[in-house]
UniProtKB/Swiss-Prot annotation:
Native species: Delftia acidovorans (strain DSM 14801 / SPH-1)
Catalytic activity, reaction form: a D-alpha-amino acid + A + H2O = a 2-oxocarboxylate + AH2 + NH4(+)
E.C. no: 1.4.99.-
SUPFAM superfamilies on file: FAD-linked reductases, C-terminal domain, FAD/NAD(P)-binding domain
A GO biological process held by the record: D-alanine catabolic process
GO cellular component: cytoplasm; plasma membrane
Name listed for the protein in its UniProt record: D-amino acid dehydrogenase
Any single Pfam family the record assigns to this protein: DAO
Cofactor(s) needed for function: FAD
UniProt keyword Flavoprotein present: yes
Gene: dadA
Pathway participation: Amino-acid degradation; D-alanine degradation; NH(3) and pyruvate from D-alanine: step 1/1
Length: 432
């Protein structure tokens, strides 16, 4: 079976790896000159299933209004002139009820927890190295109100049997010693000891190398001009004036998936949400984090790699604008200097990327109404967290294996209310 995977980020490469492991003949196409050159290039570095939480949550609409008035707000909305942006935001607002939040969080955690186990198995199978750490993640609260509000998430963690620890301000430094200098500015924290961290860019490049050893062909500098449809199937992909054909196709273009599939009449509710990061050379290890720390006030993650600190976060809804905003750099510098002043911020590299976000936070994984076209996109801020599980799921669906977890509520038909065409069996639409 020949499979074309469109996209060479962490989602596309993990899909290719698992497909090759299942016996498929796989080719990966990407417009860049190397794997993980866009959204997977410099993300926050956390693999955090326990924090797989929908942005669409009770209270978020009011918080969003308040954030718009703040200098260092975690969210910014700039109208891009498209009807799709307005429709996407309306869909997100409809998912802000307690009922929808619970449904969406369960779906996200299902994929994320499975993905962690897949990553651990992949690591055991391949010995892959990507500056990984298994020290858990720590969410920091600066106010009592934030600490009180975490009860909603704690209830879900209990329900899903996810280990956690609630810490007071004196216990924070026992987990992250460098926080001792910030003790008086903090109230407490929520620690998930099973979470991990690692360099997504390095992981993707290493896995791409491993995948080539399994026969995967990686083709870069490939500009996809469009997909060709014949008789309810994809007949090929036009790339640099050439028609490439396969038996199955996987769309893993991230934020650009919608544009690629719109001519086919597929309406993907995937919007580009812009995020930023700083990669800071490590100066004083005693004033650096041991793993990942999440600042609840600014919605920013600070992650330790071997000799670097990665500071990432924020969300801008403004289309496909990739300009670097110096105000966002100032916010990232503010947080890392306040919590972990052990890096050389003056020599930090500043980066931005577009996360492919769905209104309900859940990725879109599965079949479409075109019998040989599959989707693996819409992972938002959790592409690294969900990559291995998503890649394994899509490989199982394509090769006819029974997935190890339920795929309920993951396919595109939760938005279209129209069943996808499976190569074998049927699908029941799930409302979103």
């Amino acid at each position: 079976m020949k499979v074309l995977v469109l996209g060479g980020g962490v989602i596309g490469v993990t899909s290719a790896y698992y497909l090759a492991r299942a016996g498929a003949e796989v080719t990966v196409l990407d417009r860049q000159d190397a794997p993980a050159s866009e959204t997977s290039f410099a993300n926050a570095g956390q693999v955090s299933p326990g924090y797989s939480t929908p942005w669409a949550a009770p209270g978020i609409p009011l918080k969003a209004l308040k954030w718009m008035l703040q200098e260092h707000a975690p969210l910014a909305v700039r109208l891009d002139g498209s009807l799709f942006q307005l429709r996407w935001m309306a869909q997100m607002l409809r998912n802000c009820s307690a009922q929808r939040y619970a449904v969406n969080k369960e779906r996200m955690m299902r994929v994320a927890e499975y993905s962690r186990s897949c990553l651990q198995q992949l690591r055991a199978d391949t010995g892959i190295a990507y500056e990984q750490r298994t020290g858990g993640t720590l969410q920091l609260f600066r106010t009592q109100a934030q600490l009180d509000a975490v009860e909603r998430d704690v209830a879900v963690l209990r329900e899903c049997a996810v280990p956690f620890e609630l810490l007071d301000r004196d216990q924070l430094a026992q987990v992250e010693p460098a926080l001792a200098q910030a003790r008086d500015r903090l109230t407490g924290g929520l620690r998930l000891p099973k979470d991990e961290t690692g360099d997504c860019h390095r992981f993707t490049n290493e896995l791409a190398r491993i995948a080539t050893g399994l026969g995967v062909e990686l083709r870069f500098n490939q500009n996809v001009d469009g997909l060709v449809v014949e008789g309810g199937r994809i007949a090929g992909v036009r790339v640099n004036g050439e028609l490439l054909t396969a038996d199955r196709y996987v769309m893993a273009f991230g934020s650009y998936s919608r544009q690629a599939l719109e001519p086919l009449g597929l309406d993907l509710p995937v919007y580009p949400v812009k995020g930023y990061s700083l990669t800071v050379p490590l100066g004083n290890p005693a004033l650096a984090p041991q793993s990942t720390v999440l600042d609840e006030t600014y919605k920013i993650a600070v992650t330790r790699f071997d000799d670097r600190i990665r500071v990432g976060g924020m969300a801008e809804l403004g289309g496909f604008d990739l300009r670097l905003d110096p105000r966002r750099r100032a916010t990232l510098e503010l947080v890392v200097n306040d919590l972990f002043p052990g890096g050389d911020v003056a020599r930090a590299s500043f980066w931005t990327g577009l996360r492919p976000m769905t209104p309900d936070g859940t990725p879109i994984i599965g079949a479409t109404r075109y019998a040989n076209l599959f989707l693996n996109t819409g992972h938002g801020t959790l592409g690294w967290t969900m990559a291995c599980g998503s890649g394994r799921l899509i490989a199982d669906l394509i090769t006819g294996r029974s997935p190890e977890i339920s795929t309920d509520g993951l396919a595109l038909d939760r938005y279209t209310h129209r069943p996808a065409r499976h190569l074998g069996g049927s699908s029941t639409p799930v409302s979103a």
